[in-house]
Swiss-Prot record:
Pathway: Amino-acid biosynthesis; L-histidine biosynthesis; L-histidine from 5-phospho-alpha-D-ribose 1-diphosphate: step 1/9. It holds the Pfam family tRNA-synt_His. Its main location: cytoplasm. GO terms for biological process: L-histidine biosynthetic process. It comes from Azoarcus sp. (strain BH72). The gene is hisZ. This is ATP phosphoribosyltransferase regulatory subunit.
């Protein structure tokens, strides 16, 4: 059947498309007034550029094809963040802070969940050039503002720090393969598995690793972590970052999950996930990723977030698309001026093509432009 789409690929019909576009404009305008400049990376690039500095999961999610011009392997973007990082590092080449935003379709080889689309409409913001925690504070607050403007306010923003995991894994002396296994166990909060894999790890490192899954809650979690962590400059710096975030964002619904390490291959510091709208899955993900720009010849401090606009729109009431005005195809003097005046006021006006009586309501018309006593007026459309 030629009209059947692949699994997890959907059309956006007029009402949904109108809702998505209105949401896109509103959020991009919010970025603009906060100093974030819009960039539009290409849909496909050479594969090594798209996946450089990213984890294995991004490589597996990327569709691949052969470029008929160069013979090189290309990929359809699965995440726009590496592209924006390339633009900052290699094209803009700014010395100071750079704030960039973006919105576009990405394509995934597999859906992220059973109900997810394989063509998310990714929207995000990135802040480059500032290594301090002030940049992370700005980005988390921007995310909260964006969700509020989208009318899906965050009910919870979970914050973690991959620096804690990296420091503990290094102190435990784990080889990369063992570190991967440890990461998987922490993500699953598999305490029996953690006890088994940490046999032989010296104290207090082992105790700290076993405590991580339970370190979830309010700002008090940071002090609990400090009490059980070994002495380390990296651990001390990570906990200081979390304390500053807790103090600066106390008006937001933030919590701390020190075992949440999603994207730890990619991120280098603070990580966060926002929840809301009754969704069990995160609406937005973000964090610091200072090392990714190295692949493009220029390492820059970087932090940001992204979300799927389609998923966000599902949490909103169905959009009410304003009806259009049906105008005569031809009329007396003044018709063209009347139509243009209505369009200038934001109304949709379409011409009544002959031979389609009885179908104009289906086409979206709910009013008509008619001549009454020498003047063009708008009236309800009846029986069309």
């Amino acid at each position: 059947m030629r009209w059947v789409l692949p699994d997890h690929i959907q059309d956006a019909l007029p009402s949904e498309a109108a809702s998505l576009e209105a949401l896109r404009r509103r959020l991009l305008d919010a970025f603009r007034v906060r100093g974030y400049q819009l960039v539009m990376p290409p849909l496909l690039e050479y594969l090594d550029s798209l996946t450089t500095g990213a984890g294995q999961d991004l490589k597996l999610r990327t569709f691949k094809l052969v470029d008929q011009v160069s013979g090189r392997t290309m990929g359809v973007r699965a995440d726009m963040t590496p592209q924006v990082t390339r633009i900052d590092a290699h094209l803009l080449n700014r010395a100071g802070v750079s704030r960039l935003c973006y919105c576009g379709s990405v394509l995934h080889t597999l859906p992220s969940t059973l109900t997810a689309t394989r063509e998310p409409l990714q929207l995000g913001a990135e802040l480059y050039g500032h290594a301090g925690i002030d940049a992370d504070i700005e980005i988390v607050r921007l995310l909260a503002d964006v969700l509020r403007l989208a009318e899906v306010p965050a009910s919870r923003i979970d914050i973690g720090h991959v620096g804690l995991f990296h420091a503990l894994a290094a102190l435990a002396g784990m080889v990369p393969e063992r570190e991967e296994e440890l990461f998987d166990l922490l993500q699953a909060k598999d305490v029996p598995g953690l006890k088994e894999i940490t046999v032989g790890v010296a104290e207090p490192v082992r105790t700290a690793l076993l405590r991580l899954p339970a370190l979830y809650g309010g700002a008090e979690v940071i002090d609990e972590a400090a009490a059980c962590m070994p002495e380390s400059a990296e651990i001390r710096a990570a906990l200081d970052d979390l304390r500053r975030l807790a103090a600066a964002l106390e008006d937001l619904p933030i919590s701390f999950d020190l075992a949440d390490l999603r994207g730890y291959h990619y991120h280098s510091g603070v990580v966060f996930a926002a929840y809301g709208g009754g969704s069990p899955a995160a609406l937005a993900l973000g964090g610091r990723y200072d090392r990714v720009g190295e692949a493009f010849g220029r390492a820059r401090p970087a932090t940001g977030f992204s979300l799927d606009l389609r998923e966000l729109a599902l949490r909103l009431p169905a959009a009410v698309v304003p009806g259009a005005i049906l105008a005569p195809l031809e009329g007396t003097a003044g018709l063209a001026a009347a139509v243009e005046a209505l369009r200038a006021a934001g109304e949709a006006v379409m011409s009544r093509l002959p031979g389609h009586e009885g179908t104009w309501n289906d086409a979206g018309c709910d009013r008509q432009l008619v001549m009454r006593q020498g003047a063009w007026v708008v009236e309800p459309l009846q029986g069309e």
